């Protein structure tokens, strides 16, 4: 959708549209306090797979709203599935290098404690060839890196192809979170073409 606006100084009509937008969804207070206290106790070791069906079901329900916002045609898909969840435990000196989540459509992080933020990378390599100085609140729109603070009981969902990392923990406080991957079960690609597949 193209939005039009008038520049107040020159009175010229300028076209404004967001090309190739990347949406990141953030929800604070995702779980009720009792649920949050229970799930915090489950994360004991780094990269340990978790069996949390109630959490996964709630994430899948939120994905329905997100897919609707993105204009995804649900008739092409059978279900939304959280394929795996695992704990992240970052002690002093630990971090996560830049990575993506292969073979999935969406991924996410759920913060159990505060600590270093998740930093998302600009996915277009040439976009930061000329770096301007932006106001702090413009980072989400124009920065080459976007910082998502680690706030306990906050859920962040993002495209799996979006590179992200966490700087090494410089404190004695342990940073804990839960990561997860999501797939839409159903048909992908152009129907009737050699590129069509069913997942």
How would you name each of these model-derived features?
Residues 154-158, 163, 172:
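Beta-rich strand-turn-strand
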Residues 172-182:
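A short alpha/beta connector and helix-capping loop motif
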């Amino acid at each position: 959708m193209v939005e039009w606006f008038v520049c107040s100084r020159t009175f010229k009509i300028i076209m404004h549209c967001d090309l190739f937008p990347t949406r990141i969804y953030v929800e604070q207070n995702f779980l009720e306090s009792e649920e949050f206290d229970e799930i915090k106790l489950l994360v004991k070791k780094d990269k340990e797979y978790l069996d949390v069906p109630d959490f996964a079901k709630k994430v899948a329900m939120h994905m329905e709203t997100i897919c609707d916002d993105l204009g995804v045609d649900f008739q092409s898909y059978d279900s939304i599935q959280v394929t795996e969840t695992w704990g992240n435990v970052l002690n002093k000196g630990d971090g996560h290098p830049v990575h993506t989540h292969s073979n999935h459509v969406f991924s996410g992080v759920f913060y159990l404690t505060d600590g270093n933020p998740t930093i998302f990378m600009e996915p277009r390599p040439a976009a930061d060839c000329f770096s301007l100085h932006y106001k702090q609140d413009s980072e989400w729109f124009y920065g080459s890196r976007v910082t998502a603070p680690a706030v306990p009981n906050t859920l962040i969902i993002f495209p799996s192809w979006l590179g992200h990392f966490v700087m090494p923990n410089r404190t004695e406080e342990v940073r804990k979170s839960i990561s997860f991957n999501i797939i839409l079960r159903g048909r992908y690609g152009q129907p009737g073409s050699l590129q069509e597949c069913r997942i």
